Amino acid sequence: MAPEASPERSCSLHTCPLEDPTGAPVPPPTVSTLQAIDPTSPLTAGHFAFPRAPQDYQEGSSLLGLGDQASLCAHVSNLSTSIDTSQHDGVWKQPSVQRHVVSVRQERTFRMPKSYSHMIADWPVAVIVGCLAFIFLCTLAGLLGSPPLDFSEPLLGFEPRDTEIGRRLEVWKAMQALTGPKNLLSLSPDPEMNSSSLLSTLSPAAWGRAEESVVRTKRMVGPVEVKEEENFFCGRPEKSHAKLVFVSTSGGSLWNLQAIHSMCRIEQEQIRSHISFGALCQRSAANECCPSWSLGNYLAVLSNRSSCQDTTQADTDRTLALLRFCATFYHRGVLVPACVGSSQDKPPFCAQVPAKCTGSNVVYEFLHYLLDRDFLSPQTADYQVPSLKFALLFLPIIKTSSLLDIYLDGLGDPIKVSDNYTSISGMDLGLKPRLLKYYLAEDTMYPLIALVVIFFGMSLYLRSLFITFMSLLGVLGSLMVAYFLYHVAFRMAYFPFVNLAALLLLSGVCVNYTLIFLDMWRLSRGQVPSGGMPHRVGRTMHHFGYLLLVSGLTTSAAFYGSYLSRLPAVRCFALFMGTAVLVHMGLTLLWLPATVVLHERYLAHGCVAQAHGQRGGSDPLRLLLALHRRIRIFRKIISILSRLLFQRLLPCGVIKFRYIWICWFAALAAGGAYIGGVSPRLQLPILLPLGGQFFRSSHPFERFDAEYRQQFLFEDLPPNEGGNLPVVLVWGILPVDTSDPLDPRTNSSVVSDPDFSPSSPEAQEWLLALCHGAQNQSFFGDQPEGWPTLCLVEALQQWMESPSCGRLGPDLCCGQSEFPWAPQLYLHCLKMMALEQSPDGTRDLGLRFDTHGNLAALVLKFQTNLPYSTEYGPVHHFYTEISRWLSTEMSKAPPGLNQGWFTSNLELYSLQHSLSTEPAVVLGLALALAFATLLLSTWNVPLSLFSVAAVAGTVLLTVGLLVLLEWQLNTAEALFLSASVGLSVDLTINYCISYHLCPHPDRLSRVAFSLRQISRATAMTTGVLFASGVIMLPSTILLYRKLGIIVMMVKFLGCGFASFFFQSLCCFFGPEKNCGQILWPCAHLPWDAGTEDPDEKGRAGPPGFSEHYELQPLARRRSPSFDTSTATSKLSHRPSILSEDLQIHDGSCCLQHAQAPVSPRDLLLDHQTVFSQCPALQTSSPYKQAGPTPQTWIRQDSQGQKTEPLQALPEGPAHCPKSKVEELPDGLCSSASTLEGLSVSDDTCASEHSVRVPDSVGTSPEVMNGTGHPILERGQLNGKRDTLWLALKETIYDPNMPNSHHSSLSWKGRGGPGDISPVMLPNSQPDLPDVWLRRPSTYTSGYSS
């Protein structure tokens, strides 16, 4: 303390009244550390008063920062006396009582921080404000410099771009959109002769939808004559009408009167009674809503009833007999619309059909549209009572988004659309895109609830709402900065909807970082009890900063690996998510430690003080206090169970059963690889993303597409209407996609081939040969009418010889029989043929003319005999066969036609081809980038390989489980699989870095060290993310559900592989010391501390005196008394710390001078570090008081004058300092052994045979020579325990001191400046001397636990 005359001065956290009875002025302070003072010094206890320190400082719960305006300092005596000096005397003397002299000095209000830790500790508010200002500026620039978010088309971007097939499809779509009268390309050479059409004014996307509508209409059966009885309906049902599928509630047949009446009743109550139905329905000539095409209405028409409800059972029986009779002709293919009616120009085969089957359209439409394909099929026609499983109802409403109100008010409720007989199980209302947008906004609550669960679990673990809130703010800030970089720095124009998933995924990364940092922060309090806030920040960030950099870089690299995909949405997500992880890593380095320092300094003490200060008051207050006490009791129980699980059971279980864990997880990974890649493997999609699955499988919209659509015969494609794959050959336009591959909203334009020349004689001959060669191929099929023929040259020859050649007047082309023709004549004749056969510019002859009337391109088509399929295999065979044939032909083409290419209906195949090849490549690249990042960060090959093996096992098992869950490899699944590496890599890196930074050289101790240090935070992270995934399962949107499943599965499996598989691999093959390490010059590893060369140690400080005492090697046989002696030693009055973290010490046994730190601060750092890492050997049986245990030492100053014997400071077993402000988590004690949990097991506590027992350093006080120097002597062990390692982490033990006093003062005596006194190892035999070991003053940069 300072002299009494010093005025009272205030620190930032404490008020320190200082008094000086002598009135002497305060000498200027030199350092800011606590140091023991020699009693003969002028600054001894007699000169100072020791007032009561504040409560929080006494308990060791808070650390003063070096940046306080009034710092707590200590004076350093200039005397040369020390403990080292006293050891030169011939007699051992009791050391003096350690007394701390504290003074207060005034410092400058503002000063520049000396280092990163000083900046965080001294200016936490400034750091946080600076980060907030940076986030605000980036957010403002990102919002102002980018277009507003548009999620109107959430599935946009899931079609492959920038692939060979994709480029050709984009160019072909652009050519179709730009072809027409008054357009860039035309079918006629003279645009003035063509009238404008609707298609020329449509955009490419709108034109495609219009063409699709035309194609769908053409596939419908053509109109036929309507009979008088059919005037009940408004025409015939079309595919464009809204459809409902009815099933039986009881599982029986729908062909009964009760079920038919039930369907009519549900339609009337839930659809026709809706207020919007009248405005949407199709109306008859009488301006009334047309009746529905339903089972009951067709039955009423055949039975001459006025409505569905008037039908009887006899009507159903009579109609069933008629349908049974006519079904035979329908399935034979002779009952077709052409045979229906009374017209005379029927096909000849219609004579086979009886008149009662063709007298009306009702019978045909009954069988073709309303009944499922199995009802009255040839296989079930002989059944006495056929079963109708599904019945279709066509509403007189065109499929449109206007049906949303009807769906939400009635059809969307399963209870309203079902009764005791029937229920609506499937729907096709054309509402999937519109309903997707609705549910995307409606189900957003599930991801938000998942976020609440994540941060609520974090707050329970941290016990701080402030840190939790700041962590959430850091996540949001990181996303906003990433959004700024995404748009402004990377120039990305498209922001897909899937990028919003980054909020949930980045929150999981934040939880992992925050929990680990807080564990290390609490741990550093016990390791650095008096080092100040800057040293505590530096101590924590020494380990956490390394872990954060490695984890952040590896995770972002894994996400960036997905950029290799050709799906624009996946590439945009990879870029945004990888950038967000990097930004969050950078902000965490500043934001998180500053937040914790701010909480530690201003919030933690105040909150606890208020809680302890309110002891009385009203009944509600007492009730709250009672509840608080119960919660604390429950929390203590959870803490005890957590300590038992993560500090004892988990390390023991991993190390003891490591053989089982390796085999089990390797088998799981191999099984996942086989299931996902061989059989049954992930199935490719059979629908395009716009027609794919949006909602969960039980949704009626999805059930109609997946189950019911193929149950009705009208959905089948007729064999002569687009059933086969066409081939489109293009010359004159290069297959170059000019659109932005990362923006699916952009459309490509056409790029002309400058070398295109189809008029040369060689080109004419080659085109004719190409026609004949294609006709001889096995894939060439029958050509439909009106198609542009592949044989353009033959068509021109036929036209020249036909009478129609001269229809436009005399021309040079007519009658030309010489071949090949002159180039100018050839081009002129092609133009004349186009004008004659397509005067309005609507017939496609395969010619494309530009605006000047010149031939710009050739587009020739032919039909193959290969049927279109949604399966990948047949279409892949078609594509490879056509590509091989065309490549061969193009190799023979003349220079003007050698740039030709082909395309077809390959949209689905393009997606399937990308999904069949890219996920494996993307996952492999992500794993390779993760390995490279780990290797560059740790420079350790085995650890990098083991980490990547654990991540790969997680991904393989995830894929296998997804196959068992019947997932298809669709676009969403490809996105989540590409992100699985980034989601699972951080948990493994936690253990990898903790293992790498462990100061212990042997692999078992390092495995236990990493498990005890990281496992609880890893388990908590996995738990909260698993819970968040469960929360998202009830969502209607399939994207949310699958995101929840992926998060659950990847995090759970990743935790298992990291905790058991990776650690078990390290138990077997983990690197020891420098094994597998890529060494660089001047490299210093954590476990190299204490093994420096004596000469190097001599240069570290002034010379001193040091003795080395060598113990006898331990036996390799384990004693039966292992467990008994361990248990009794814990119950004895002397400290015993079980450990297997033996530090290898290669020092020699000769006399050499010990090194003292050059400054008290260095002394403090060295002393604390060594005490937590330098082990020794100790006997373990119950201690005997009869042994010769010295109680006092006699100290001697430099002049040889003896001082009074002083009692040594006692110190009990090492433990965590218990604080009234905040309890440390169990298992985070700095002095606890890394394998303390293994001491209870007789099987797992044995050391490896490969680990040698090191030499220890010691000096015996009983054996001294005449000059006061110790005599080296072998120590004795009683042999009761073999290969047991004990860590020296205590000061001198005093048996007269109570155990409670030992516990309360153990942390205070540890690490004090100048405390390098020897430590006694009591022998269990009363007739043998104890062993005394000298504490070396060696500083190591390792991080101890």
From Swiss-Prot:
Topology of the protein relative to the lipid bilayer: Multi-pass membrane protein
One GO CC term on file: plasma membrane
Location in the cell: Membrane
Residue ranges of domain SSD in the record: 429-598
Polar residues bias: start-end ranges: 1297-1306
Tagged with keyword Glycoprotein: yes
Transmembrane segments: 125-145, 440-460, 465-485, 497-517, 544-564, 572-592, 659-679, 919-939, 945-965, 974-994, 1019-1039, 1043-1063
Family, similarity comment: Belongs to the dispatched family.
Residues with Omega-N-methylarginine modification: R1310
InterPro entries from the UniProt entry: Dispatched_Hh_regulator, HMGCR/SNAP/NPC1-like_SSD, SSD
Region Disordered: start-end pairs: 1-28, 1251-1271, 1295-1345
Glycosylation sites: N304, N420, N776
Keyword Membrane tagged: yes
Keyword terms: Glycoprotein, Membrane, Methylation, Transmembrane, Transmembrane helix
Gene giving rise to this polypeptide: Disp2
Family matches, as Gene3D superfamilies: Multidrug efflux transporter AcrB transmembrane domain
Protein name in UniProt: Protein dispatched homolog 2
Native source organism of the sequence: Mus musculus (Mouse)
